[in-house]
Amino acid sequence: MIKTTGLTLHYGSSQILHGIDFEAKVGQITCIMGTNGTGKTSLLKALAGTHPRSGGSVELAGEPIEVLRPQQMAQRGLAVVPQGRMIFPLLTVRENLETAFALLPKSEHRIPTDIYDLFPVLKDMTHRRGGDLSGGQQQQLAIARAMIMQPKLLLLDEPTEGIQPNIIQQIGHVLAYLKAKGGMAIVLVEQFFEFAYALADYFYVLRRGAVSVFGPANNFEKAALRAEVSV
């Protein structure tokens, strides 16, 4: 679904990513892990087309991509749940969900029934302002908003950060549901090891802006992978 070859990325004169070869396939959850400052979020931005790469190539469904505007991202079937959630605090839950309509044809301006099935708290709080929700509820709202776009590629940046355990478990169930539903590639940047290990089909571990190890989840002993991630 999405593939990079020799990807490099700079912020000013500082090189952040060094020759990244990466691939995420439909029907799989591909997890990017590593300690703080290893380039995980920068790689996600390069995949999303929201930050220009310095070198190498990125292909989405076999077609090269450059820096993309939100409308172009949606047209390519790409949705992002960024770190920090980025919901609109003064809009209601329903209005936040409806902001996804701006990136869809008018015929698709509806909230799918499975959104409220997967996130019942959003149905209960449909008229409450986004800023009044807890951090976990805001994260559910951000994921639901991305799902309304019916993406073929879903990118999530540390969705468990600062979230209470019961909502982390629910988010895990949602990602497992989306994977089983098919037709979507999921890329997950995550630092919560147990959450990632339970869900991911494929791992990339970054160290100092480069891939240190990668491979299918069943290739790794749990303790060995944990040790790689913590270096």
Name what the model sees in each region.
Residues Q169-G182:
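Helical segment within the ABC ATPase nucleotide-binding domain
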Residues A146-M147:
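ABC ATPase C-loop
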Residues G56-P64, R76, E108-D117, V213-G215:
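Conserved ABC transporter NBD signature motif
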